[in-house]
């Protein structure tokens, strides 16, 4: 001990006796603690301290460490190590307040997206220090994301926003929920046509997507409804003069996807309800097949129940509610309940007349290879402004067609074009006289009153028609109103089970004004009724992206005076059929 003290004092005296140098190197300026992990590069290159003083400091520290080790005292280094950042390559100096213990490794956590590693070996840059190795890992967490709403969400996001600059659904009110950080990346091979060579890894993001998507979408609609009643909730849609797009809402920024030559790189981030850009949630074709395969048999049978309900009124309402609940719980282990219900329904199906079975076979349509190839080309890569079909004073671009991809939201152009195809078909014998109003009709009527849409029916007498279809768009959701002039009633059909009494009242008042203008007579409003279809009376969507498809298929079945018997699992086929129908301007 005394020898050690003598050695230290001797070193100090020798240094004090030496003359001070004429010019000393400038010291590096200290950085504040706030800039410890700054990505900015310090451009001031200042020479380091002179080696002699640096040598002395390290000798003192080394001596103190040896003394502490001799007496068994814990020793802490209060040095200012140089930290090399892995994300930007700059050197950052830790503040003097940072304390690093002599444990084998230490971990510091800060906010950000990169990691910094600090390794102090037995030798310092000057070759003197031999204190233990210290490893400091600075892991920066993923930043919390706030997304735009379908987010889905999907996705996210947000969901690759709508091509060709149509009316967009911008943000999801649920986007304020934080993301859970997850550091995992998966490169996945996907076949556009459902090839066999690829296997999907087990992804946390996709667990329960189909299970929760409908509930999340319903919450979004409730939030939007509250905003419509006078709250300060910001509008989720920006309007364009030509069309409206909805994909932004369910896609997530964290769900980045590339579909080049069948390869998709997905950064797995837990899919919370943030309507994200929600590039929101786009699932692959294989995911869709896996989802639909598990539900196909059940939904076919449920379709029978929907169909049977049309002939028996409200008798089956309790059973149907249970069946819909069972479908929504499909991913949560209710297989036993479903098997029991399926067996009961299959037994009842045997009693259906052959006419009912023939009606169901209408939906079992298979596309030929040539049709599949043509559809794939239309949905494939190409200029988004390329016009693929033109009719009814409407032009359908490749960007519009691509809204018919699975889990994408339909825009105005596609829906208006399809409604015109239904009107053209109704001119054939055996179909009811039909007229379809534009998707922009109701927003214009609601904002400007009858005078704003007075000329929209120029040359058309609505009262000569049997059915009038009115597609309704409310921020991020599509629904349909059917005016049945034969029965003097208005029906509101919503794939999310919402009610539309106020919408029907506005349209009924429009009919009153139209009758005064075109026929100079008043309607007897006491003879007219309006009704919102209940969830057990019409098929309901099980995700957050098919509301536009359900609206089109409601119109298709009603325009043929057919019971609505389709189900959710048929949507992928219906999307492909609609692509072909728009390209060839005729319905299959």
Curated annotation (Swiss-Prot):
In residue numbers, the region (Disordered) covers 157-184
Q: Which SUPFAM superfamilies match?
A: Cysteine proteinases
Could you give one GO CC term from the UniProt record?
PML body
Q: Where expressed (tissues)?
A: Ubiquitous. Highly expressed in brain, lung and testis.
Q: Does the keyword field hold Transport?
A: yes
Membrane topology per the entry is: Peripheral membrane protein
Q: Where is this region: Axin-binding?
A: 72-381
Residues spanned by motif Nuclear export signal: 316-331
A single Gene Ontology MF term assigned here is: deSUMOylase activity
Q: Where does this chain carry the motif Nuclear localization signal?
A: 28-31, 47-52
UniProt similarity note? Belongs to the peptidase C48 family.
* Stated name of the protein: Sentrin-specific protease 2
């Amino acid at each position: 001990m005394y020898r050690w003290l003598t050695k230290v004092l001797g070193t100090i005296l020798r240094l004090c006796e030496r003359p001070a140098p004429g010019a000393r190197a400038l010291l590096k300026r200290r950085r504040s603690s706030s800039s410890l992990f700054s990505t900015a590069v310090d451009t001031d290159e200042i020479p380091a301290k002179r080696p002699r003083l640096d040598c002395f400091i390290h000798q003192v520290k080394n001596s103190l460490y040896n003394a502490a080790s001799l007496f068994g005292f814990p020793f802490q280094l209060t040095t200012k190590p140089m930290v090399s950042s892995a994300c930007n390559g700059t050197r950052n100096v830790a503040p003097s307040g940072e304390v690093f213990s002599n444990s084998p490794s230490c971990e510091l956590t800060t906010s950000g997206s990169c990691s910094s590693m600090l390794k102090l070996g037995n030798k310092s840059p000057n070759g003197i220090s031999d204190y233990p190795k210290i490893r400091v890992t600075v892991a920066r967490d993923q930043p919390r994301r706030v997304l735009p709403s379908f987010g889905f969400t999907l996705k996210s996001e947000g969901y690759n926003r709508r091509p060709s600059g149509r009316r967009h659904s911008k943000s999801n009110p649920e986007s304020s929920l934080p993301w859970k950080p997850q550091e995992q990346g998966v490169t996945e091979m996907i076949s556009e046509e459902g090839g066999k060579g690829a296997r999907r890894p087990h992804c946390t993001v996709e667990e329960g997507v189909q299970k929760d998507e409908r509930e999340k979408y319903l919450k979004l609609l409730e939030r939007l409804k509250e905003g419509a009643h006078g709250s300060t909730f910001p509008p989720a849609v920006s309007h364009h003069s030509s069309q409206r797009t909805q994909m932004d809402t369910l896609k997530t920024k964290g769900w980045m996807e590339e579909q080049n030559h069948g390869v998709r790189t997905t950064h797995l981030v837990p899919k919370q309800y943030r309507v994200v850009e929600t590039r929101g949630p786009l699932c692959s074709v294989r995911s869709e097949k896996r989802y639909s395969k598990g539900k196909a048999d059940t939904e076919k049978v449920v379709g029978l129940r929907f169909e049977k309900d049309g002939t028996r009124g409200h008798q089956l309402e309790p059973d149907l509610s249970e069946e819909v609940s069972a479908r929504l719980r499909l991913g949560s282990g209710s297989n036993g309940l479903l098997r029991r219900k399926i067996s009961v329904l299959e037994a009842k199906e045997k009693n259906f007349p052959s006419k009912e079975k023939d009606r169901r076979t209408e939906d079992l349509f298979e596309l030929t290879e040539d049709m599949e190839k043509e559809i794939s080309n239309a949905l494939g890569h190409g200029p988004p402004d390329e016009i693929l079909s033109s009719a009814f004073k409407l032009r359908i671009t490749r960007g519009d067609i691509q809204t018919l991809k699975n889990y994408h939201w339909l825009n105005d152009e596609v829906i208006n074009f399809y409604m015109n195809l239904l009107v053209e078909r109704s001119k054939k014998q055996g179909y009811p006289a039909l007229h379809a109003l534009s998707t922009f009709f109701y927003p214009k009527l609601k904002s400007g009153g009858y005078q704003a849409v007075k000329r929209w029916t120029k040359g058309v007498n609505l009262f000569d028609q049997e059915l009038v279809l009115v597609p309704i768009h409310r921020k991020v959701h599509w629904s349909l109103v059917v005016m049945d002039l034969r029965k003097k009633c208005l029906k509101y059909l919503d794939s999310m089970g919402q009610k539309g009494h106020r919408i029907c009242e506005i349209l009924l008042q429009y009919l009153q004004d139209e009758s005064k203008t075109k026929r100079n007579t008043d309607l007897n409003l006491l003879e007219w009724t309006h009704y919102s279809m209940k969830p057990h009376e019409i098929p309901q969507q099980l995700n957050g992206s098919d509301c536009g498809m359900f609206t089109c298929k409601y119109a298709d079945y009603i325009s043929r005076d057919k019971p609505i018997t389709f189900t959710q699992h048929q949507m992928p086929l219906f999307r492909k059929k609609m692509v072909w129908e728009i390209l060839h301007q005729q319905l299959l």
